[in-house]
């Protein structure tokens, strides 16, 4: 305890004896007088001192000095009491609060020294408010944001980065990897990544979405798992960091505000007793002791399993985080290359309605973007007041019968297959399909025409497999139509040679064949000789008729006997014709017709 403050007597009571009356009336004549010595003035003039005493002290200046002195003493008492109470309060404050209060006191002391003594209390309060207002930071204008102000995306990514760095207490991924730390690292890893590079990209606002940040984080962990072996610490930490990071940055954790701010506790160091200590404790170590030591060492140095095994409870969350990351990457890629497209799939409800679900919809929309699919959505709306559509038959492209002998198709087929009838051509088209199929079948048969029966049978089997058995049916039907046509014609004696095994005399057929061949040969020679003789005659008649111009077109000379001889039907024997007309009957003059 300090020294107790001594109380001061504020005043002394005195009176003048000459002015007082009786002792009973003296109480009203007490006068308050200060207990002070009179002022002494010492003047030095030329080395001599002159002392002068002041008067009785009843001047007006004395009372003014007295009031100022009492006011100052009163202030000092208040300050002392305030300091004492503040010291008692400071006992229960922490260091930061004490430091802050000391700075405030120092600042106030400096301000009071700068202020003049004649300022009023009101002015001082206003002055204090103004000074305190200047200590506050100047607010930036809202219309012109500061250049270094971070965007909400940057703040979110910085928060993610801080949380991820807490998961790496040893700082393995804090800075870029060099060849001195990991020899041959850049020969294996082509795209290195670390936390410092990610922080620079955040500060430069290079990340346009959280998906790009997650892609760089996954690249960093994949690089560590690619370069290091599974039993190393770096591989295990990278796999664990990948799992926890994706779980933290998942959409559900971001929406629910799942903040994992707890720092990982360092694993306690396990100190195994050395073999020497064991021997000291037991001079004769048994086999059980060695077995226990081996089991303990194997449990310590045994490599950890996968961070996300099939039996792990966090496996589903890890897979969900990876799936969400892949979905976000696919959505960003679609929006980047096809910004206005809507990709989805069709789904049928229980009531039978068909719904189209959009995959790359708005990610902020929690509900699925679905559309009902019906005929009105697939086709345009019909105009009102039109219930039926008009129909007009087009007669310009009317289909006619294709099997008639006068059509263009039958004429074309006759030019391609001159030795076949229209019915046979139809059978071939029905069996082989088109012209290409018919030509292919004929080409194969022509190729094995001079071969044996085995090759022909192989070709027929091949055509049957190609046409599905239509080849054999076509040949059978064509052979049947030929047999029907031959039954109506003259008997073919040469076909009877196949019945030689029957008890019939076939010697006469060979002689008939020889006679028929000789007759056909002689007839062909005679026809050629006659035609060669008639050609010069036709040439002479043509010259006679075309050499001289007739006098008038109305009169034409009569036909001569030579003309009738050359134009007779017996001379025109080029093929078999049923109706042959005399060409000269159309060239008679009109005079002869009038005479008749």
Curated annotation (Swiss-Prot):
One of its GO terms (cellular component) is nucleus. It comes from the Eukaryota. The record marks 181, 234 as: Histone H4K5ac H4K8ac and histone H4K5bu H4K8bu binding. InterPro entries: Bromodomain, Bromodomain-like_sf, Bromodomain_contain_prot, Bromodomain_CS, DUF3512. Residues 1-31, 49-119, 537-596 are annotated as: Disordered. GO terms for biological process: chromatin organization. Residues 226-228 are annotated as: Histone H4K5ac H4K8ac and histone H4K5bu H4K8bu binding. Its main location: nucleus. Coiled coil: none annotated. One of its GO terms (molecular function) is lysine-acetylated histone binding. Residues 1-10, 74-84, 99-109 have a biased composition (Basic residues). Residues 148-252 form the Bromo domain. It is found in: Nucleus. Keywords: Bromodomain, Chromatin regulator, Nucleus, Transcription, Transcription regulation. Residues 548-559 have a biased composition (Low complexity). Residues 61-73, 85-98, 537-547 have a biased composition (Basic and acidic residues). Binds acetylated histones H3 and H4. Binds butyrylated histone H4. Plays a role in chromatin remodeling and regulation of transcription. Acts as a chromatin reader that recognizes and binds acylated histones: binds histones that are acetylated and/or butyrylated. The Bromo domain mediates interaction with histones that have acetylated lysine residues at specific positions. Also recognizes and binds histones that are butyrylated. This is Bromodomain-containing protein 9. The gene is brd9.
């Amino acid at each position: 305890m300090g020294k107790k403050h001594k109380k001061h007597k504020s005043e002394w009571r005195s009176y003048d004896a000459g002015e007082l009356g009786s002792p009973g009336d003296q109480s009203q004549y007490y006068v308050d007088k200060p207990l002070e010595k009179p002022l002494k003035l010492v003047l030095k003039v030329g080395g001599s001192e002159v002392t002068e005493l002041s008067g009785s002290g009843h001047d007006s200046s004395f009372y003014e000095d007295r009031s100022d002195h009492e006011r100052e003493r009163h202030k000092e008492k208040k300050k002392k009491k305030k300091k004492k109470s503040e010291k008692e309060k400071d006992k229960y404050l922490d260091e930061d609060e004490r430091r802050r209060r000391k700075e405030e006191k120092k600042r106030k002391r400096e301000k009071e020294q700068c202020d003049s003594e004649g300022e009023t209390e009101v002015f001082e309060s206003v002055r204090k408010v103004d000074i305190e207002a200047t200590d506050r930071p100047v607010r930036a204008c809202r219309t012109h944001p500061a250049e270094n102000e971070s965007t909400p995306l940057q703040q979110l990514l910085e928060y993610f980065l801080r949380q991820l760095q807490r998961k790496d207490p040893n700082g393995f991924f804090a800075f870029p990897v060099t060849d001195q730390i990991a020899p041959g690292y850049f020969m294996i890893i082509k795209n290195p990544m670390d936390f410092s590079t990610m922080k620079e990209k955040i500060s430069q606002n290079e990340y346009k979405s959280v998906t790009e940040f997650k892609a760089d984080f996954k690249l960093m962990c994949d690089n560590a798992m690619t370069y290091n072996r599974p039993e190393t610490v770096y591989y295990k930490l990278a796999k664990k960091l990948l799992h926890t990071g994706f779980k933290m940055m998942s959409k559900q954790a971001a929406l629910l505000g799942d903040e994992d701010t707890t720092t990982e506790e360092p694993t306690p160091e396990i100190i195994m007793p050395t073999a020497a200590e064991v021997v000291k404790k037991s001079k004769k170590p048994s086999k059980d002791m060695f077995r226990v030591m081996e089991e303990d060492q194997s449990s310590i140095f045994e490599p950890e399993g996968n961070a996300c095994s099939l039996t792990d409870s966090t496996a589903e969350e890890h897979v969900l985080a990876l799936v969400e990351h892949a979905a976000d990457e696919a959505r960003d890629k679609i929006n980047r290359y096809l910004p206005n497209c809507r990709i989805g799939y069709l789904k049928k409800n229980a009531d039978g309605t068909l719904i189209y679900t959009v995959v790359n919809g708005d990610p902020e929309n929690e509900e699925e973007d679905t559309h009902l699919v019906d005929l009105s959505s697939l086709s345009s709306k019909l105009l009102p007041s039109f219930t039926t559509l008009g129909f007009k038959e087009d007669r310009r492209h009317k289909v006619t019968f294709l099997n008639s002998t006068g059509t263009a198709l039958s004429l074309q087929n006759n030019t391609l297959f001159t030795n076949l009838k229209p019915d046979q051509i139809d059978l071939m088209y029905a069996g082989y399909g088109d012209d290409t199929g018919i030509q292919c079948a004929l080409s194969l048969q022509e190729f094995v025409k001079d071969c044996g029966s085995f090759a022909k049978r192989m070709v027929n089997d091949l055509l049957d497999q190609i046409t599905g058995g239509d080849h054999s049916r076509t040949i059978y039907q064509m052979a049947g139509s030929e047999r029907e046509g031959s039954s109506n014609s003259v008997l073919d004696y040469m076909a009877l040679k196949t019945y030689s095994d029957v008890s019939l005399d076939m010697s006469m057929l060979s002689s008939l064949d020889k006679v028929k061949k000789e007759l056909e040969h002689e007839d062909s020679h005679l026809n050629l000789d006659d035609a060669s003789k008639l050609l010069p005659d036709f040439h002479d008649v043509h010259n006679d008729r075309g050499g001289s111009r007739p006098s008038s077109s109305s009169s034409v000379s009569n036909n001569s006997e030579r003309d009738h001889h050359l134009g007779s039907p017996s001379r025109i024997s080029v093929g078999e014709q049923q109706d042959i007309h005399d060409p000269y009957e159309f060239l008679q003059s009109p005079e002869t017709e009038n005479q008749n």
